[in-house]
């Protein structure tokens, strides 16, 4: 029984020598439906690494299943440290096109999921900030209302007492001053009146 062979020169054959390539996963095995001439014309798709992980799995464990169902070979290279990966699709041209469409549809689907997740997170942040602002405004209004009530209570309790005390003091002072001012005049008038009466009275002679 023949041992399945690999393609040790696949990356060297299809990639420029100057391009730094990090191979992710193993080189594909040869299947009965795969012909060596398919290595000459690969289709290339470039995606973010996180999308490649979503589509094929973190360890590329879904690649064998896709290869068997689509009768193509898939090889993934990481081209740069910024998170971009290159997917090489080998096989019949029609199968290559179908596989690339499937990959791009899955990539769009995962992008939409991420956008929805980001939108929900943003909406939650906005709602939290609005709640904090409303809570702060409510606390400020309540504090202001309480202070206004305290001020009104202090004013209501203090003002009548002070007014009554002030009025009483003013009345007593006015009465004292009035009595003091009128007493000498009244006394003088009384003395003068009595003196006049005594003068007008007839003198009884013996």
From Swiss-Prot:
Induction: Induced by etoposide and hydroxy urea in neural stem cells. It comes from the Eukaryota. The modification Phosphothreonine is found at residue 145. Keywords: Chromosome, Cytoplasm, Cytoskeleton, Mitochondrion, Nucleus, Phosphoprotein. It holds the Pfam family MOEP19. Residues 166-183 have a biased composition (Polar residues). GO terms for cellular component: cell cortex; centrosome; chromosome; cytoplasmic lattice; mitochondrion; nucleus; protein-containing complex; subcortical maternal complex. GO terms for biological process: positive regulation of dendrite development; positive regulation of double-strand break repair; positive regulation of double-strand break repair via homologous recombination; positive regulation of neurogenesis; protein storage; regulation of protein localization. The modification Phosphoserine is found at residue 171. Residues 40-103 form the KH domain. It is found in: Cytoplasm; Cytoplasm, Cell cortex; Nucleus; Mitochondrion. Contains 1 atypical KH domain, which is still capable of binding RNA. Component of the subcortical maternal complex (SCMC), a multiprotein complex that plays a key role in early embryonic development. The SCMC complex is a structural constituent of cytoplasmic lattices, which consist in fibrous structures found in the cytoplasm of oocytes and preimplantation embryos. They are required to store maternal proteins critical for embryonic development, such as proteins that control epigenetic reprogramming of the preimplantation embryo, and prevent their degradation or activation. Component of the subcortical maternal complex (SCMC), at least composed of NLRP5, KHDC3L, OOEP, and TLE6. Within the complex, interacts with NLRP5, KHDC3L and TLE6. The SCMC may facilitate translocation of its components between the nuclear and cytoplasmic compartments. Forms a scaffold complex with OOEP/FLOPED, and interacts with BLM and TRIM25 at DNA replication forks. Interacts with PARP1; the interaction is increased following the formation of DNA double-strand breaks. Interacts with NUMA1. This is KH domain-containing protein 3. It comes from Macaca mulatta.
């Amino acid at each position: 029984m023949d041992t399945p062979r690999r393609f040790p020169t696949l990356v060297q054959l299809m990639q420029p020598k100057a391009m730094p390539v990090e191979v992710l996963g193993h080189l594909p095995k040869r299947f009965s439906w795969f012909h060596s001439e398919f290595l000459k014309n690969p289709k290339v798709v470039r995606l973010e690494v996180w999308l490649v992980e979503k589509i094929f799995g973190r360890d590329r464990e879904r690649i064998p299943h896709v290869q068997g169902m689509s009768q193509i070979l898939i090889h993934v290279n990481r081209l740069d440290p910024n998170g971009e990966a290159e997917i090489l699709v080998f096989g019949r041209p029609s199968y290559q096109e179908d596989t690339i469409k499937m990959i791009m549809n899955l990539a769009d689907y995962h992008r939409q999921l991420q956008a929805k997740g980001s939108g929900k997170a943003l909406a939650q942040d906005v709602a939290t900030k609005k709640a904090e602002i409303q809570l702060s405004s409510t606390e400020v209004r309540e504090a202001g209302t309480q202070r206004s009530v305290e001020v009104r209570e202090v004013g209501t309790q203090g003002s009548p007492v002070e007014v009554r005390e002030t009025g009483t003091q003013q009345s007593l002072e006015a009465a004292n001053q009035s009595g003091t001012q009128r007493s000498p005049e009244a006394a003088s008038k009384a003395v003068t009146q009595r003196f006049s009466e005594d003068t007008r009275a007839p003198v009884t002679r013996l």
